[in-house]
Amino acid sequence: MSLRAVWHLGLLGSLVGAVLAATHRGPAANTTDPLTHAPVSPHPSPLGGFAVPLVVGGLCAVVLGAACLLELLRRTCRGWGRYHPYMDPVVV
């Protein structure tokens, strides 16, 4: 995989994870009945039954993005090490 593809996958994974995390809404903050002031159960997620798969998918996208960005960092540092005057040459 080329360095550019790794870079784009890393950015895409990070952005998808951030968007999914930002769009997920938890239970409602006000959980009391306005008339009786009795506690009520929170409203279901506005995403319905898809909330858990979206969160898991977002976490997977974040992990993919982090792995790609770490691979990019590893390749970049290896490339810099080849030209450092005080280091032995790196055999690839």
Curated annotation (Swiss-Prot):
Role played: Inhibits host cell apoptosis. Induces an increase in reactive oxygen species (ROS) in the host cell.
Tagged with keyword Signal: yes
Cytoplasmic side: 71-92
Protein known as: Envelope glycoprotein J
Species whose genome carries this gene: Human herpesvirus 1 (strain 17)
Glycosylation sites: 30
Positions on the Extracellular side per record topology: 22-49
Family designation: Belongs to the alphaherpesvirinae glycoprotein J family.
Signal peptide (UniProt feature, chain positions): 1-21
Places the protein is found: Host Golgi apparatus membrane; Host endoplasmic reticulum membrane; Host endosome membrane
Topology class, membrane: Single-pass type I membrane protein
Entry's transmembrane regions: 50-70
Main subcellular location of this protein, as a coarse class: host cell
Keywords, alphabetical: Glycoprotein, Host endoplasmic reticulum, Host endosome, Host Golgi apparatus, Host membrane, Membrane, Signal, Transmembrane, Transmembrane helix
GO cellular component: host cell endoplasmic reticulum membrane; host cell endosome membrane; host cell Golgi membrane; membrane
Pfam families on file: Alpha_GJ
InterPro entries: Herpes_gJ (IPR004913)
